[in-house]
Structure formats: structure tokens, C-alpha cells
């Protein structure tokens, strides 16, 4: 018997290192697989995602850029369960997909949260490209499970698993913009069999989810993001050039006082 809440960093992403992603096997995966829950060696990608901020340099100028980052899926598909009651969204970072497999154990598998209808997976290892232009073809496997529940009525045991251990400490969770913390609290409370308090505590926090952006719109936004700072600088330079030119012309007139 026993009851567990497992948040597992199975997929590891290193953006500021050699820009790669790999699988970190801890041994917990083998235990879960024997009970009917398999964590795949992949990275979930989702068109409904968070953003990644990075610094880009144009000559002597440095700019902060924000780009959509499909490896940070925004999860809005939840099953009907006490644990997910009242949840609207969660933001994950480098999550792997979960699947149910047949085993001789009496554990019952229940999906709790899935990626969107425009999502997919990339097999590890992964090399991240922040400049990649994502298309519909990249999101070729929808509704990937990111959190699931295993229950065994014979010994009253249960295990809640989510494939991101950092979902409680990412900035979105800290700011309260998503239901990451609520999911963890609901899970622990349900596992402790205090489910009557869950409905009282749920806050129905809403995270605004943007509509999927088409390829054409992405391309337009990309060029606006690239060209706008340059055009502003050129505009300022042209304005100062014209102003200085006008001053020089005025100084050439008799009686001019600066």
C-alpha cells in the first residue's frame, strides 16, 4: 500500500549550455512501468505554449526577444476528477508523454492532464532552435498525457505522476497566473483522503490562453520584431541629421543667434 505524489524531471533541457535536451532516467520510471504507467523518452511540443526570453545582438546593440517556445506547453485539457476540479491551465517546462501499458498488477490508470489538439513529441535527444519556424506538420501527435493517476483498490494505494518537477517553481506558478500549485495541492490532499476540502480551496484562477497563431502571422511578427528596432534607430538618426543640418543653415544667415 501507500500513496505517492511524483513530479519527475524525465526530460532535461539546457538552453544556456550546449543547447540540447536529454533524458534523465532516475529508476522511478521502472517502478511506475511495472504498475502500468510508462514515461516515454521524448519532449512534448505544443502550439499552445509559453514564451522564452533571450538576448540577441545586432552590431553594437543588444535586444531582448520573446519567442513562442513549444517545449513549454500550456495545459488546458483536464479529465473530470476531484484532483483536477476547477483547474483552468498549467504551464510546464520540458515534459515527457505518458502512456498506459498492460501489466499483471491490479492498478487502474487514469489520465489527468493532456496537451492540446495541436501538439506532438520529439524523440530525445533534442537540439533546441529558438529561430525555428514551426508549422502544423511539427505537431503531429495530439493529446499527449502529461499527468496521470494509478490506483489499486486491493491495498488502497495510489500514485499521482506529472512529468515536470519544476512546474511548482517556474515564474508563472510563482506569479499565480496558472493552476500549477493548485494541481499539486489537490493531488496531495486527495492522496491524504481529505477530498472534501478541495472544492472549498479551489480558486478558479484563470490563465489567459491565446488563440493559435498561423504561420503567416508568425512570419509577419518575426520581421516586425527584427526590423522595428532598426527602423526606430534610423528614424532617430535621420531626425538628428536634419536638425543639425538646419542649424548649420541657420548659422550661415547674418544676425543668427544660437
PLM region spans:
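Acidic, S/T/G-rich, low-cysteine, solvent-exposed domains in lumenal/extracellular/periplasmic regions
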Residues: 1-196
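Hydrophobic alpha-helical membrane-insertion segments
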Residues: 18, 172-173, 238, 246-249
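Juxtamembrane/interface motifs at transmembrane-helix termini
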Residues: 21, 26, 219, 253-255
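A glycine-rich phosphate-binding loop feature that marks nucleotide/adenosyl-phosphate handling sites
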Residues: 47-52, 203-206, 256
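Short, aromatic-rich amphipathic segments at membrane interfaces
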Residues: 167, 174, 199-225
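Intrinsically disordered or highly flexible coil/loop and linker segments, enriched in small
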Residues: 193-200, 233-236, 240, 248
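Selective detector of the "anchor" transmembrane alpha-helix that sits immediately C-terminal
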Residues: 221-243
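Cytoplasmic C-terminal tails of single-pass
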Residues: 247-258
Amino acid at each position: 500500500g501507500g500513496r505517492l505524489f511524483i513530479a519527475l524531471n524525465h526530460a532535461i533541457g539546457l538552453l544556456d549550455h550546449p543547447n540540447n535536451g536529454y533524458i534523465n532516467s532516475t529508476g522511478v520510471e521502472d517502478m511506475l512501468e511495472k504498475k502500468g504507467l510508462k514515461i516515454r523518452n521524448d519532449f512534448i511540443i505544443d502550439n499552445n505554449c509559453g514564451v522564452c526570453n533571450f538576448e540577441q545582438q545586432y552590431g553594437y546593440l543588444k535586444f531582448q526577444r520573446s519567442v513562442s517556445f513549444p517545449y513549454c506547453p500550456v495545459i488546458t485539457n483536464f479529465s473530470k476528477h476531484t484532483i483536477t476540479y476547477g483547474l483552468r491551465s498549467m504551464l510546464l517546462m520540458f515534459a515527457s508523454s505518458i502512456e498506459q501499458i498492460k501489466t499483471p498488477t491490479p492498478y487502474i490508470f487514469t489520465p489527468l492532464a493532456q496537451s492540446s489538439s495541436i501538439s506532438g513529441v520529439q524523440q530525445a535527444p533534442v537540439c533546441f532552435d529558438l529561430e525555428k519556424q514551426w508549422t502544423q506538420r511539427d505537431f503531429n501527435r495530439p493529446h499527449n498525457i502529461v499527468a496521470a493517476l494509478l490506483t489499486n483498490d486491493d491495498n488502497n494505494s495510489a500514485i499521482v505522476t506529472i512529468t515536470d518537477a519544476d512546474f511548482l517553481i517556474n515564474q508563472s506558478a510563482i506569479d499565480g497566473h496558472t493552476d500549477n500549485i493548485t494541481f499539486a495541492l489537490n493531488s496531495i490532499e486527495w492522496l491524504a483522503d481529505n477530498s472534501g476540502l478541495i472544492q472549498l480551496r479551489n480558486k478558479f484562477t484563470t490563465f489567459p490562453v491565446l488563440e493559435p497563431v498561423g504561420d503567416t502571422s508568425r512570419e509577419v511578427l518575426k520581421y516586425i520584431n527584427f526590423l522595428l528596432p532598426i527602423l526606430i534607430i534610423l528614424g532617430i538618426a535621420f531626425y538628428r541629421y536634419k536638425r543639425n543640418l538646419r542649424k548649420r543653415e541657420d548659422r550661415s544667415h547674418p544676425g543668427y543667434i544660437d
